[in-house]
Amino acid sequence: DYIHSLGLKFGIYSSPGPTTCGDYLGSYQHEEIDARTWGRWGVDYLKYDHCGYHAVQKDSEEKTIREPYIVMRDALDKVDRDIVYCVGYGAPNVWNWAREAGGELWRTTRDITDEWNVVTAIGCFQDVCAQATAPGNYNDPDMLVVGKLGKAWREKVHESALTPDEQYSHISLWCILSAPLLIGCDMSDIDDFTLSLLTNNEVIAVNQDLLATPATKLLTDNGQIWYKKLYDGSYAVGFFQIDPYFILWDQDEAEAI
């Protein structure tokens, strides 16, 4: 109730295995009791991470990896509460089966860090899975690495290593992708710049557009252009200099899109 009174959602993390990534207890063979407990607590969001499942996994076939996610989906469906279900990354091409396993969103790549080469590698890969995006079903390229962050495995909290321009590009691309906008920073200590990034109504409107149209990537000789059609018939277009070159914009080519 306290979390909800602040206007926030209550998210929780678990694994289909006996343990989680952090070596805490997972939900293996306790799916229904965990789902009921989360419902009673008022949980709004579940990230169900593949970590730990390797200990009991029979093989690496897609069917085997998908199975425990279906078990948890069935358990959540028995709870009298809507809990958004994120299928954690655990297999190649997760976007091909996560929807059928009951996920509303699914992690598409490795964990993100606040390094520009990692952000661009993850973001620019999303055209491979873009067609899986639809209203209520979303590719998740991982959280936004803005603000004060802690690196993996509890390392010291620090300011994002991304430059301001890199952060603009990071959030802009995630919005064009209709990606979930999850922040991993310290919410009690957000600076004005980070707050301005996270509260830009025009950019958020692109992310939240009702159509959730899959984004399209166009390659140029010296950059990338991403675009998607919006509900009102207009287009959101993003220009991204992944490498230190200029992008040349031709209005005739733009109208041909």
Segments from the language model and where they lie:
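Substrate-binding cleft of carbohydrate-active enzyme catalytic domains
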Residues: 1-57, 61, 68, 72-73, ...
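Residues that form ligand- and interface-recognition hot spots within folded domains
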Residues: 14-16, 89-91, 241
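Flexible loop/turn segments at secondary-structure boundaries
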Residues: 18-21, 54-56, 92-95, 153, ...
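Active-site-adjacent structural elements in folded domains
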Residues: 21-23, 31-33, 157-161, 219-224
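Glycan-recognition surfaces
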Residues: 30-33, 82-186
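Generic recognition of short, well-ordered alpha-helical segments
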Residues: 60-63, 67, 97, 249
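Carbohydrate-binding surface patches
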Residues: 168, 174-177, 182-184, 219-257
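Catalytic cores of secreted or luminal carbohydrate-active enzymes
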Residues: 169-218
